[in-house]
Amino acid sequence: MSKSSDRINLTNQFLIAMPNMADPTFSGTVVYLCDHSERGALGLVINRPTDIDLESLFNRIDLKLEIEPLLHIPVYFGGPVQTERGFVLHEPVEGSSYNSSMTVEGGLEMTTSKDVLEAVATGTGPKRFLLTLGHAGWGAGQLEEEISKNGWLTVAADPRIVFDTPAEERFEAALGLLGVSSSMLSGEAGHA
């Protein structure tokens, strides 16, 4: 392995699953990488809505959500790790600090504490957010290995895809950042 100073940091990038993705958990997914270091990586799948909406989830955790446009926003499957835990990917809120937030270098924030949901419920929280149950995680070197085996494409993340693009269009929209579409991809790795 090269020196750590030569390492590529994929924080604030999208991982786009290649057609040959063997793991059905990640087939067809776009993952927003919140953290990538020599210790591993943590990300949130942004294009797998569940059957649970915000109203249902808030009721389960005894929060009253009365903001009509938010009631039926879906909760997403964020990945197979800690699926009972909520992860909120959101734009920074000026003047706010939540109990358990991580600022993604050059990008968004990820918060895991209930106070961000309380702020959303009262209309004082982030206006643009995506709530997931669970996250995706990779151990040291694991993600790099998957990328080297043609499992993922990477591209700089665009918050408009996370927050403004319908879930079913996010995969193609992320590929579009690279100037390609899924019809152009092959599951076979090649060498020129």
From Swiss-Prot:
InterPro entries: AlgH-like. It comes from the Bacteria. GO terms for cellular component: cytosol. Gene3D superfamilies: VC0467-like. Pfam families: DUF179. Belongs to the UPF0301 (AlgH) family. This is UPF0301 protein BTH_I1462.
